[in-house]
Amino acid sequence: MLHQMMKAKLHRATISAADLNYEGSLTIDTDLLKASGIRPYERIYVYNVNNGERFETYAIEGEAGSGAIQLNGAAARKGMIGDFLIIVTYALCSDDEVDEHRPNVVLLNPDNTIKEIVK
Protein backbone atom coordinates (compact mmCIF):
# COMPACT_ATOMS: atom_id res chain seq x y z
CA MET A 1 0.00 0.00 0.00
CA LEU A 2 1.16 3.55 -0.68
CA HIS A 3 0.70 6.37 1.80
CA GLN A 4 0.57 10.03 0.83
CA MET A 5 2.94 11.77 3.24
CA MET A 6 4.04 15.37 3.62
CA LYS A 7 7.37 15.75 1.81
CA ALA A 8 8.18 19.43 2.37
CA LYS A 9 6.67 22.53 3.94
CA LEU A 10 7.38 26.25 3.88
CA HIS A 11 5.58 27.49 7.00
CA ARG A 12 4.28 31.07 7.21
CA ALA A 13 5.68 32.34 3.92
CA THR A 14 4.64 35.96 3.41
CA ILE A 15 3.19 36.95 0.03
CA SER A 16 5.60 39.54 -1.37
CA ALA A 17 3.96 40.16 -4.77
CA ALA A 18 1.15 39.11 -7.10
CA ASP A 19 0.91 39.21 -10.90
CA LEU A 20 -2.55 38.44 -12.24
CA ASN A 21 -1.35 38.61 -15.86
CA TYR A 22 1.44 36.06 -15.46
CA GLU A 23 0.62 32.66 -16.94
CA GLY A 24 0.32 30.87 -13.60
CA SER A 25 2.25 29.32 -10.73
CA LEU A 26 3.84 30.52 -7.50
CA THR A 27 7.28 32.11 -7.65
CA ILE A 28 9.44 31.05 -4.69
CA ASP A 29 12.93 32.28 -3.79
CA THR A 30 15.37 29.61 -5.04
CA ASP A 31 17.07 29.48 -1.63
CA LEU A 32 13.73 28.50 -0.05
CA LEU A 33 13.12 25.84 -2.70
CA LYS A 34 16.53 24.31 -2.01
CA ALA A 35 16.12 24.45 1.78
CA SER A 36 12.74 22.71 1.62
CA GLY A 37 13.47 20.26 -1.19
CA ILE A 38 10.62 21.58 -3.32
CA ARG A 39 11.59 21.30 -6.98
CA PRO A 40 10.83 23.76 -9.77
CA TYR A 41 7.55 22.83 -11.52
CA GLU A 42 6.55 20.49 -8.68
CA ARG A 43 2.89 20.49 -7.67
CA ILE A 44 2.39 22.47 -4.50
CA TYR A 45 -0.57 22.83 -2.19
CA VAL A 46 -1.04 26.33 -0.83
CA TYR A 47 -2.99 27.24 2.31
CA ASN A 48 -3.63 30.93 3.01
CA VAL A 49 -3.59 31.44 6.79
CA ASN A 50 -5.29 34.85 6.57
CA ASN A 51 -8.36 34.02 4.49
CA GLY A 52 -8.63 30.22 4.53
CA GLU A 53 -8.14 29.81 0.77
CA ARG A 54 -6.67 26.46 -0.27
CA PHE A 55 -5.43 25.82 -3.79
CA GLU A 56 -2.83 23.94 -5.77
CA THR A 57 -0.43 25.13 -8.44
CA TYR A 58 3.24 24.57 -9.25
CA ALA A 59 6.46 26.17 -8.03
CA ILE A 60 8.81 28.23 -10.17
CA GLU A 61 12.19 29.62 -9.19
CA GLY A 62 12.53 33.17 -7.97
CA GLU A 63 15.75 35.11 -7.49
CA ALA A 64 17.94 33.62 -4.76
CA GLY A 65 17.99 35.72 -1.61
CA SER A 66 15.06 37.87 -2.75
CA GLY A 67 12.49 36.44 -0.34
CA ALA A 68 10.10 36.19 -3.30
CA ILE A 69 6.74 34.54 -2.68
CA GLN A 70 4.68 35.72 -5.64
CA LEU A 71 1.20 34.56 -6.59
CA ASN A 72 0.86 34.39 -10.38
CA GLY A 73 -2.08 34.14 -12.76
CA ALA A 74 -5.39 33.05 -11.26
CA ALA A 75 -3.66 32.34 -7.93
CA ALA A 76 -3.13 36.11 -7.57
CA ARG A 77 -6.81 36.29 -6.59
CA LYS A 78 -6.23 33.88 -3.67
CA GLY A 79 -4.30 36.24 -1.42
CA MET A 80 -2.99 39.71 -0.74
CA ILE A 81 0.53 40.99 -0.24
CA GLY A 82 1.37 40.40 3.42
CA ASP A 83 -0.83 37.29 3.82
CA PHE A 84 0.82 34.24 5.38
CA LEU A 85 0.93 30.99 3.39
CA ILE A 86 1.70 27.39 4.18
CA ILE A 87 3.18 25.74 1.08
CA VAL A 88 3.27 21.93 1.09
CA THR A 89 4.27 19.05 -1.16
CA TYR A 90 3.44 15.40 -0.66
CA ALA A 91 5.12 12.15 -1.70
CA LEU A 92 3.99 8.55 -1.92
CA CYS A 93 5.72 6.19 0.50
CA SER A 94 5.49 2.42 0.68
CA ASP A 95 4.72 0.57 3.90
CA ASP A 96 8.47 -0.03 4.25
CA GLU A 97 9.30 3.68 3.88
CA VAL A 98 6.54 5.32 5.88
CA ASP A 99 7.94 4.77 9.39
CA GLU A 100 11.32 6.28 8.50
CA HIS A 101 9.99 9.16 6.40
CA ARG A 102 10.54 12.67 7.75
CA PRO A 103 9.46 15.80 5.88
CA ASN A 104 11.61 18.90 5.44
CA VAL A 105 9.88 21.72 7.31
CA VAL A 106 11.21 25.25 6.84
CA LEU A 107 9.90 27.84 9.30
CA LEU A 108 10.08 31.38 7.94
CA ASN A 109 10.37 34.86 9.39
CA PRO A 110 7.94 37.54 8.13
CA ASP A 111 10.55 38.69 5.57
CA ASN A 112 10.77 35.13 4.16
CA THR A 113 14.21 34.47 5.60
CA ILE A 114 14.73 31.07 7.18
CA LYS A 115 14.00 30.98 10.90
CA GLU A 116 14.56 27.24 11.40
CA ILE A 117 14.73 23.99 9.45
CA VAL A 118 13.09 20.99 11.12
CA LYS A 119 13.77 17.50 9.81
Curated annotation (Swiss-Prot):
UniProt-annotated location(s): Cytoplasm
Q: Does the keyword Ribonucleoprotein apply?
A: no
- Active site positions, chain numbering: 25 (schiff-base intermediate with substrate), 58 (proton donor)
Q: What is its EC number?
A: 4.1.1.11
**Post-translational modification summary for this protein:** Is synthesized initially as an inactive proenzyme, which is activated by self-cleavage at a specific serine bond to produce a beta-subunit with a hydroxyl group at its C-terminus and an alpha-subunit with a pyruvoyl group at its N-terminus.
Q: Does the keyword Lyase apply?
A: yes
| Family membership | Belongs to the PanD family.
Kindly give the NCBIfam families that the UniProt entry links to this protein.
panD
Reported function: Catalyzes the pyruvoyl-dependent decarboxylation of aspartate to produce beta-alanine.
Full protein name: Aspartate 1-decarboxylase
Protein encoded by which gene: panD
